[in-house]
Structure formats: structure tokens, C-alpha cells
Amino acid sequence: MAKLKITLVKSLIGRPESQRVTVRTLGLTRTNSSVIKEDTPQIRGMINKVAHLLKVEEA
């Protein structure tokens, strides 16, 4: 299965709590932090929910 590199590029300050929880669940803690995750439907759903805050690329 493919892997995705997910980077938080925008701050969570002033964002709704649901978006903050989603970003934390992805494992991102601060701006410019990155994680590598498997490309699953569950991860894609979380990415779509906060896509405006993230940069996603193939790992």
C-alpha cells in the first residue's frame, strides 16, 4: 500500500475544535511537522476534512 507524507502548513490557532482533534489524530503537533502514514480510506477522510491546513505528497 502507498504511503503519504503529511505536513501541517497552517497554524491551528482560531480553528474549530473538530479540526484540531483531526490534526492531532493524524499525529501532527506543530506547524511544519510531518508524518508518514499508510494511504487508507480512514486517513484520506481525515486529510479531506482539514485539507486546507495540510500539504500531502507521496512518500
UniProtKB/Swiss-Prot annotation:
Q: Which InterPro entries match?
A: Ribo_uL30_ferredoxin-like_sf, Ribosomal_uL30_bac-type, Ribosomal_uL30_ferredoxin-like
Q: Which organism is it from?
A: Pelotomaculum thermopropionicum (strain DSM 13744 / JCM 10971 / SI)
- Family to which this protein belongs: Belongs to the universal ribosomal protein uL30 family.
The protein depicted here goes by the name Large ribosomal subunit protein uL30
GO MF annotations, alphabetized: structural constituent of ribosome
Q: Name one GO cellular component term.
A: cytosolic large ribosomal subunit
What's any GO biological process attached to this entry? translation
| UniProt xrefs under HAMAP family | Ribosomal_uL30_B (MF_01371_B)
